[in-house]
Amino acid sequence: MTEAPMRPRRQMLTADRAKLCTKLTALCLALLAAPLYGQSGLAATSPGTVSYGSPTFAVQNTSDLQMQSPYLGGVPAGRASATALSLSLEDAVGRGLRQNLGGLLSSDAVSGEQGERWRALSALLPNLTTGTSFGVHQVDLKATIGIKIPVPGVPPVTGPFGVFDTRGYLDQSVFNWESIERARSSAAQVKSAQYSYKNARELIVVVVVSNYLLVIADQSQVESALAQRDTAKVLFDQTTDQKKAGLAAAVDVLRSDVELQAREQRLIVARNNLAKQKLVLARAIGLPAGQIFDITTEVAYQPLTTSSLDEALQQAYTSRADYKSLTEQVRSAELQKKAASAERYPTLSAIADYGSIGTNFASNHGTINAAAELRLPIFQGGRVHGDNLVADSLLTRARQQLEDLRASIDQEVRDTFLDLQDTAQEVSVAQNAVRLATQTLQQSRDRFSSGVTDNIEVVQAQESLADANDTYIGSLYRYNTAKVSLARAIGFAESNYALYLKGQ
């Protein structure tokens, strides 16, 4: 009997799985993540640059994505404890929503837009100031008011005398349509930033849950590798005993020893992958540096019954926070266009002051001044025309981005439906493959124990079971990730991720 070259195939399968998981995670984050910076405005992207949310960025360099994406980082809270932290999926999501860097930056962006809103309102609200002054003056009447003929009793130079003046000043815009439209535009930008913050929370849930599921998958890999190592150890001991009894050849002992060493190596790699994936999860949820933890939530296979595709699309268009955010940006751009056109309109403002003036504080008396100012723009050097061109460009760009996002949502929902159908079938097939591979291994071990065959058949059966376990773990991870992706695609990730994972 000729031994099949199973080792290169196993190494290729393990490497392919690692590459697939890495690409899935990177592409998931890149496709789902909206650009965090400039989310409250309509910032242009220069030709040749790649934004954080583009698939090209993720494919170019996954490590760069991990270093630069704010959703993969977090602000550590508290100090690490010596005891292991029990971390459930709900706890991980809660920590992520509080400490994830993407959410914190998005919250700061809302505060920034609220500040811009107040700046825009300041052009419409009253501006009230007060001032007090005191000075000593000496006046040359001849030089100041042009008295050339001496006046009896009036000296040519008066003073020195003091002047004390304290008063309040009021400046109020009565009519300025440009400022009104810009204030309304800033209000739309605040709403856009608030929706962007909600969208950031959705993305945080996807990132945290995906990383938590990866920890579960890696932990399952460790358990599978440990079981396979123990099985290989039993085979090695059994083969060694049979050789001592003269029932097995030396090559059978070597073959079982090679298999045992391979399983030891795979266990080492699996434990290392689990430890590194825990670090990724800890960073995303803001755990203190060096904090050890154990996951406590088990996510088993639960079939998900979904609504129809048309219903899911309608829910997405009405629920997605990023779609609402961009809709508000379109509205803001429309108001900016109106504001640019309003620069041609006249403006009316009122100014007034009231105070007390005199040579000193004791001899003051009240005075008041009031005036109205009407400004009629005639020619402003082409500035109004330029502002209108800029506003037109921003409005066109915002509308194009909204239509593109609508098409992107349609594609995303359809993709998740396809992924759910495909991965559900994968899980079913993988479960059957594990069952058959387990039976095959048991029968091969029985045949070897009975002396019907050598241990080549047992080694091959162990390889088949290892492949089947790897496939099942990967398919279950992809299926659960597809559930969370569907919740995100519809706009319910934060509120319904747990229900989707439970198949409800």
Give residue spans per PLM region.
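Short segments within alpha-helical structural elements
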Residues: 122, 233, 262-287, 434-492
